[in-house]
């Protein structure tokens, strides 16, 4: 697409970053100044009743700056990147029609990628095929299935850990249904995003600082009632660790504690470690992201001013 045709597209802003980097605070600050409406880009914030452990914006923050695509699913329900793209495009169109600019804020990089580049035409899940794969795993083990994937799709096998049954079974399922590998199909992208996007990533300058923030925030969550929040989910009886909601960082570790599998101290340790690993993955993804403007979260006023400088021309 030429620069001229790009310039004629409606505007949008991406504010990306690792967990605990200050994205929400900056987005709320920007909403006071720019004609923007916020859309959450977070695979954990979509769930109702999961507020403390996801660091969901509180009632006061949401009053000052409403976020779309929060609390749109029960924890028992699944939500895919395709679901997000459909919902986000609808919200963006609504915001643009009102003469305002969509500001998409969050840390689920897969959602940002799906929105920006479109989705490859992967086949829908097939319960029968999935059941056969799981039966084979029960009989032979996931290591055996991982070796099978190495023969079928070595690129996907290199990316997927043998202890990640969800992604492993999906890669095999795609091949068994379509006859094409996951790698082959994902190289065929869908429709690009019909917006002129200004992309920002916010993070602390030092990894140690981010690690400190993550640990502090995890302890703040515990002090704010995180255990009680997960106990309420646990008591429902219909939720389990195979669900994406309960696999969210922090929730999975607390769940293991409530099931008596690990001690409280071990839960805290694992929760902090898992959150740090998530942040590392998010930063790794962002480092390979093209056209992103980096912001230092330790200098919030400077970060705000840099965004205003870049997008100020579109605010009129």
Swiss-Prot record:
GO BP annotations listed: tRNA modification
UniProt keyword annotation of Cytoplasm present: no
Family: Belongs to the IPP transferase family.
Keywords associated with the record: ATP-binding, Magnesium, Nucleotide-binding, Transferase, tRNA processing
Catalysed reactions, semicolon-separated: adenosine(37) in tRNA + dimethylallyl diphosphate = N(6)-dimethylallyladenosine(37) in tRNA + diphosphate
Gene: miaA
Pfam families xref list: IPPT
Name this protein carries in UniProt: tRNA dimethylallyltransferase
GO molecular function: ATP binding; tRNA dimethylallyltransferase activity
CC cofactor: Mg(2+)
Listed InterPro entries: Dimethylallyltransferase, IPT, P-loop_NTPase
Binding-site residues for ATP, renumbered to this chain: 17-24
Binding-site positions, substrate: 19-24
UniProt-listed Gene3D superfamilies: 1.10.20.140, Crystal structure of tRNA isopentenylpyrophosphate transferase (bh2366) domain, P-loop containing nucleotide triphosphate hydrolases
């Amino acid at each position: 697409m030429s620069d001229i045709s790009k310039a004629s597209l409606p505007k949008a802003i991406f504010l990306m970053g690792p967990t605990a980097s200050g994205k929400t605070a900056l987005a709320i600050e920007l909403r006071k100044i720019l004609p923007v409406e916020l859309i959450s880009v977070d695979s954990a914030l979509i769930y109702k009743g999961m507020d403390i452990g996801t660091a969901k914006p509180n009632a006061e923050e949401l009053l000052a700056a409403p976020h779309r695509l929060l609390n749109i699913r029960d924890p028992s329900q699944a939500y895919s990147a395709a679901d997000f793209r459909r919902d986000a495009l609808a919200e963006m169109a609504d915001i643009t029609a009102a003469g305002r600019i969509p500001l998409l804020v969050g840390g689920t990089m897969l959602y940002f990628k799906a929105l920006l580049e479109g989705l490859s035409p992967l086949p829908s899940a097939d319960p029968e095929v999935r059941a056969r794969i799981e039966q084979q795993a029960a009989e032979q083990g996931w290591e055996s299935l991982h070796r099978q994937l190495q023969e079928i799709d070595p690129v996907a096998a290199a990316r997927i850990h043998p202890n990640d049954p969800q992604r492993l079974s999906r890669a095999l399922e795609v091949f068994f249904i379509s006859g094409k590998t996951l790698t082959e199909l994902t190289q065929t992208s869908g429709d690009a995003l019909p917006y002129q996007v200004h992309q920002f990533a916010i993070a602390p300058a030092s990894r140690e600082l981010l690690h400190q923030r993550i640990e502090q925030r995890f302890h703040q969550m515990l002090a704010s009632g995180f255990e009680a929040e997960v106990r309420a989910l646990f008591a429902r009886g219909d939720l389990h660790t195979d669900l994406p909601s309960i696999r969210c960082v922090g929730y999975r570790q607390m769940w293991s504690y409530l099931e008596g599998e690990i001690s409280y101290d071990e839960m805290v340790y694992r929760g902090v470690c898992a959150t740090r690993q998530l942040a590392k993955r998010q930063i790794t993804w962002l480092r390979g992201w093209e056209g992103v403007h980096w912001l230092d979260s330790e200098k919030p006023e400077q970060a705000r001013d840099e965004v205003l400088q870049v997008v100020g021309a579109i605010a009129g």
